Amino acid sequence: MLSKSKRILFGMLHGIMLLVMVHWFLISVTYLREISWLAILGAGLLFLLAWLKRDGVKRAIAWLSQHKKGFLLGAIVFQVIVMVCAELFIRRDAAVVFKGAFELLKQSSITNYLSRNPNNIPLFLYEKFFYVLFGSNGLWVMQVLNMLYVNLGAVLLYKLSQKHFNQKTADLVFLFYVSLICYSPYFYSMYTDIPPLPLIALQLWWALDLLKENQAEVSWKKIVGLGILSGVTMVIRPTTIIVMIAFWAVLFFRGNWKAFGKVATVTVMTTGFVFAGLNTAVNHQTVVPILKKDGLAKGPLLFINLGLTDMGHNQEDMKEGLLAYIDEDKRSDYNNGLFKKENVMKEIKRRLKEYGPLGLIGHIYYKQSLTVAEGTLGWLYRDVEYEKTPYINPLYAPLTKNNGLAKWVRTYFLSTDRPQYKYYEFVKQLIWIVLSAGLLGAYLKRRDTDAFNFLSLAVFGGLLFLTIFEGGKTRYLIQFLPQILLVASIGLAGFTKKENT
């Protein structure tokens, strides 16, 4: 009975993911129109040339695979260059949190912001820690750590793939990761997308270890370690619980109840205890005063409502809808109860009724299209004059403002307002199209293995989360990129001897 249920459920998952990946591939190709009509022509010619000269392409990939250290070293050089040359360093919410942590805002301002956005308190405390230790130099300590986080993720995913899949998969996942994330300025933006990347890679590694081991001889150290790691990672990025849910689901369908009870109980308890302990510490911190009033803080329901806005992340539309439930004379008050649960629930119901079944399907399709579209992973650093709360690079005025090389870097790699940025965007989109082809290839045939089912569930869970909650930005995929890259690499490389059935 359980075996039959497993075949049916994972068969349904396979069918859903195949449709999702067909859509992903088509969107990644058609997004070329947003870059330029010449981009479509150029991409078509390049892919045709690559097919005609596929032996040469294979040799080029093999050469890159043999020179991984050099490829990663080049990425580190790139990171240093863009970090030094950037003008706009941190933007939007990340800039508010940083300025508050480094005492560049009034305490009342950061208190008001964090009271409204308590999900950013862990990031504030993290940045405050480095400010207390290093003063203003704490910024550069964190940037070096960001470089460590992003590059360590490449190494861990490579080693994971070597152990659990095959060398070809390992080579591809390394090249994808370094090309998309390491050769990117995202690391210095101070979003919480980057720090958990190596932790997610470890989470996937240890989960795959446990799925591979003889269930009668599972290591207690690995079970407890996975639970502790997951609890810590959840504080940074709560969505990492999706990896654990996928792990528990695959373990459940094995039907070995003794092993499932042992592993699930210990990992659930350790994950829960660690997360609850750290979360309690965050909620009772005394570094910055937090106001506790009904309807002041943004809760989980609000992000479901935000996900129902036209693009899936339209803050102005969300606020405008909620203001309809507030008396006109109170709409400008700081704490007018805007985010009360009853108001949010009314607004969610209104939006769902307004969409109707077909409208909701269309909304989900559009939102998913925005989520998977961009090879730059949604990089959106515009010229400074368009930013509300910019934090300018301390090196800009004294060092790089009038430097020719720095201007060239900002023009071609950092500012999306510049027409020259489209060359970089085009190259990234080509890589994204190949990635999406790998994702599609992974589901063109059924791969009924525990390892693949686990990764597939982890990807599906991430996409489902972005469908229900705030979404519509490719940047939101970064938190799920390790499992996405693994599935794409498996699709391009195929499984060989190390499949685990």
What residue ranges belong to the model's regions?
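Loop-to-helix entry region of an early transmembrane alpha helix in multi-pass inner-membrane enzymes
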Residues: 117, 121, 135-152, 421-428
